[in-house]
Amino acid sequence: MLTRRALVVQSQGEVQVEEIPLPTLRDEYITVKVKAVALNPGDWKMLYGPHATPGSILGCDYSGVVEKVGRAVNALLTPGDRVAGFAFGGCPYNHDEGGFASYVTAKGDIQAKLSDSISFEDAATLGVGITTVGQAMYQALGLPLPPAIIQEAASILVYGASTATGTLAVQYAKLTGLKVFATASPHNFDLLKKLGADEVFDYRDPECGAKIRTVTNGLLSLVFDTISEGSSPAIWAAAMGAKGGKYTALLPIKNFPRSDVKVTTILGYTALGVKVSDHLPANQKDFEFSAKFWKLSQHLLEKEKIKTHPVGVRQGGIDAIPQGLQDLKNGRVSGVKLVYKID
């Protein structure tokens, strides 16, 4: 029996590296020999939160080399291809899912084939970000997909722009022809301006929202909030123009501050076309859109139109990931995405 090493949830807050069977390849899936994985805030929240499921494998972001391709995969992938993709980390319904493993089985159409110019470490940062940007900006906000650009003069606020998802959002927004306003800590201003942000504001400034509203002449109508908690609702509500607009969040917002804004909360897992919860059944529409967006993103990566997020590469492989999750949980990681090489 073929096996793999994986980071498996034991109970809420507890994980262990286990040697487990390599699952039978499903028709829409590929098997990837993992070369690197990246950590996201959602990973530690899944582990320490109420939805931690014993037996599930953590991790969403990975890169590696294709070993097998299921017969129903539409993406043009063959064994030996270098890829990066998105997995359902902590899946409560199918414990074959999850990215923190020596081998991953993942939806074959939610992948990008990589050129040799991008390292596995850099590519491992892409999975959650590409999936989320596609859902938030192009499905929820209704922006035209590149190379098409928005016809009317328009701007967008990317709140939390220095996150791995935020840096991608800034770049896609520029490719779509938007003027991009962003919030971040001051030490990340230069990075965001290099990626295309027109102006960046300190989210800790009590006047942040008012300043954005002034600079945008009260016309801001699009917001993508990558944080969706803390001070973010108050800031974007103050920044948005009098006519309201559209707002996309990654978490549900309680006590929503404005009634003239269309609010959409997205969840990346729905892009996989599988059951997420009893309230979120498999969504084929989200899957088909995400497959299309990943194909587009592969093209943009090949043309070097998209740059990856800064990484902090750590040694130790799968065994060292629990410490990284602790560091993320305790706020010890800033400005980089933690990446682990997998032997």
Curated annotation (Swiss-Prot):
Substrate binds at residues 128-135, 268-272. Keywords: NADP, Nucleotide-binding, Oxidoreductase. Trans-enoyl reductase; part of the gene clusters that mediate the biosynthesis of the host-selective toxins (HSTs) ACT-toxins responsible for brown spot of tangerine disease by the tangerine pathotype which affects tangerines and mandarins. ACT-toxins consist of three moieties, 9,10-epoxy-8-hydroxy-9-methyl-decatrienoic acid (EDA), valine and a polyketide. ACT-toxin I is toxic to both citrus and pear; toxin II the 5''-deoxy derivative of ACT-toxin I, is highly toxic to pear and slightly toxic to citrus. The keyword Disulfide bond does not apply. Gene clusters encoding host-selective toxins (HSTs) are localized on conditionally dispensable chromosomes (CDCs), also called supernumerary chromosomes, where they are present in multiple copies. The CDCs are not essential for saprophytic growth but controls host-selective pathogenicity. Although conventional disruption of ACTT2 could not be accomplished due to the high number of the copies identified in the genome, the high sequence identity among these copies of ACTT2 is likely an advantage for RNA silencing, because it allows knockdown of all copies of this gene simultaneously. Belongs to the zinc-containing alcohol dehydrogenase family. Pathway: Mycotoxin biosynthesis. InterPro entries: ADH-like_C (IPR013149), ADH-like_N (IPR013154), GroES-like_sf (IPR011032), NAD(P)-bd_dom_sf (IPR036291), PKS_ER (IPR020843), Trans-enoyl_RdTase-like (IPR047122). This is Trans-enoyl reductase ACTTS2. It comes from Alternaria alternata (Alternaria rot fungus). Monomer. The keyword Cytoplasm does not apply. Gene3D superfamilies: Medium-chain alcohol dehydrogenases, catalytic domain, NAD(P)-binding Rossmann-like Domain. It comes from the Eukaryota. It is an enzyme of class 1 (oxidoreductase). SMART domains: PKS_ER. NADP(+) binds at residues 42-45, 162-165, 185-188, 203, 333-334. Disruption phenotype: Targeted gene disruption leasd to a reduction in ACT-toxin production and pathogenicity, and transcriptional knockdown of ACTTS2 using RNA silencing results in complete loss of ACT-toxin production and pathogenicity. Does not affect growth rate, spore formation, and spore germination. The lineage of its organism: Eukaryota, Fungi, Dikarya, Ascomycota, Pezizomycotina. The gene is ACTTS2.
